[in-house]
Amino acid sequence: MNGETLQRIVEEIVSRLHRRAQSTATLSVTQLRDADCPALFCQHASLRILLIDLPLLGQLADAETGDAAARKIHDALAFGIRVQLSLHSQLLPVIPVKKLARLPLVFTDEHGLPLVLHAGSVLSYRDVALLSRGRVVVHRKCIVTAMARDAANARNIQLIKQE
């Protein structure tokens, strides 16, 4: 193998890796269940799953892999794939915030606005100071400081306290 051929091979590999790093697969839960994961993980560096339902969120939170979609999401995380889950706003008051906040997942609402799941017992100014928009979901026993509430209002961040 001469130097030119080797150079072309290296350039092609670098090009494919760069395309993969910029690529996101957007799937529904049904499409994810039917997807070929090895091929999907080889072609995409991030995975966006649209409108996750509450039972699937519960399985993810409890690390259950009985459902094919939950198993594939856990596999994606194990492979280092960035996973973004889109949730319907009506689910926010009832999702398992503490358990889901521990997972390396990114959450958005159905409109693509960022969701921050805060599992701590106190939401302080520091927790909302760097956020620019979106929603912060806190569990029902979480104390929200006055400064955090003012900072959230100033930045158009909606605070959602669970029931």
Swiss-Prot record:
Record's note on what induces expression: BMC production is induced by growth on 1,2-PD vitamin B12 medium.
One biological process GO term for this chain? propanediol catabolic process
Its Gene Ontology molecular function terms?
structural molecule activity
Q: Per the UniProt entry, what species is this protein from, by scientific name? A: Salmonella typhimurium (strain LT2 / SGSC1412 / ATCC 700720)
Query: Which function does this protein serve?
Result: Plays an essential role in assembly and/or stability of the bacterial microcompartment (BMC) dedicated to 1,2-propanediol (1,2-PD) degradation. Overexpression impairs BMC formation.
Protein localization = Bacterial microcompartment
InterPro entries from the entry?
PduM
Q: What happens when the gene is disrupted?
A: Impaired for BMC assembly, with a disrupted, unstable BMC shell.
**Family named by the database record:** Belongs to the PduM family.
Ordered alphabetically, the record's keywords are:
Bacterial microcompartment
Q: What broad class describes the main subcellular location of this protein?
A: other
Give yes or no: UniProt keyword Cytoplasm.
no
Q: Which pathway does UniProt place it in?
A: Polyol metabolism; 1,2-propanediol degradation
Spans traversing the lipid bilayer: none
Q: What else is known?
A: Bacterial microcompartments (BMC) 100-200 nm in cross section are formed during aerobic growth on minimal 1,2-PD-B12 or anaerobic growth on 1,2-PD-tetrathionate medium, but not during aerobic growth on glucose, anerobic growth on glucose or pyruvate-tetrathionate. BMCs can constitute up to 10% of total cell protein.
Question: What's the protein name?
Answer: Bacterial microcompartment assembly protein PduM
Assembly with partners or alone: Interacts with shell protein PduK.
